[in-house]
Amino acid sequence: SDVMQSKLMAGRSGYDVVMATGDLLPNLIKAGVLKELEPAQLPNRSHLDPAILAKMQSNDPGNRYAVPYLWGTTGIGYDVDKVKAVLGADAPVDSWDLIFKPENLSKLSQCGVAMLDAPGEIVPIALHYLGLPYNSTNPQDYQKAEALLLKLRPYIRYFDSSKFITDLANGNV
């Protein structure tokens, strides 16, 4: 994604079509490196989910430069037996409390805790956990999310967006 963005920003990237993540779109649009879509060339655009298009408006006002290609979710992966051994049988295994309550995460750190190296995923989840809009435009909301995440930082072994998959499967986190 960084390589693609760098090539686009430098000009003459050689790309005809790019698949940029939503968080990159505002910078690419502002820089004028994307061509506006031609609706007549996209007859199946009418079949796109209006709810997803509405969510994309925060990164692409008017949905003029992008269409959704992938849509995913972010969840919590953990070893239930390890969690219950550390936190007890009533551990909040179905709640974000499992990782966003420092008293839980401090205990779980002995098992190893990894977090996605993806602020664009983690910060909105923290905002939601705090009862704030995930796409807030209020700087104070982001300060609250930052304060929460800073409380958790000492208990996180590493940030990575792929290593945790193998480590979780092998019992390392």
Locate predicted features.
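Short, intrinsically disordered, charge-balanced linker/junction segments flanking boundaries
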Residues: 1, 171-173
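Early extracytoplasmic/lumenal segment of secretory-pathway proteins
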Residues: 1-27, 166
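Paired acidic/hydrophobic, glycine-rich loop segments that form the ligand-binding mouth/hinge
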Residues: 16-19, 157-158, 173
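Extracytoplasmic ligand-binding site segments that recognize negatively charged/polar headgroups
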Residues: 22-155, 160-165, 169
